[in-house]
Amino acid sequence: MAEEMKEHIYIIPLRDARRMPRWKRANGAIKDIRKYLAKHMKTEDVKLDKTINEKVWSRGAEKPPSKIRVRAMKMEDGQVQAELALES
């Protein structure tokens, strides 16, 4: 198993998902999270944990959260694994 190189906590804004049709907003929010992490962690290989998906879809497809707090870990092989960060 690859060892962790970098670990960051990001608060990702999901405002752009509100500009999509109502029934596509949660899908758009997931794509926005992937795009944000790919840009900031400088890689295209992004894996999202199930907890992120559950948080985005918790209020249905039409009402995703306006922002989400995510812990992203970049492995030695360049892959980014993201999970929902605990609120403190």
Curated annotation (Swiss-Prot):
This is Large ribosomal subunit protein eL31. One of its GO terms (cellular component) is cytosolic large ribosomal subunit. One of its GO terms (biological process) is cytoplasmic translation. It comes from Methanoregula boonei (strain DSM 21154 / JCM 14090 / 6A8). The keyword Ribosomal protein applies. NCBIfam families: PRK01192.1-1. Keywords: Ribonucleoprotein, Ribosomal protein. PANTHER family: 60S RIBOSOMAL PROTEIN L31 (PTHR10956:SF0). InterPro entries: Ribosomal_eL31 (IPR000054), Ribosomal_eL31_CS (IPR020052), Ribosomal_eL31_dom_sf (IPR023621). Belongs to the eukaryotic ribosomal protein eL31 family. Pfam families: Ribosomal_L31e (PF01198). Gene3D superfamilies: 3.10.440.10.
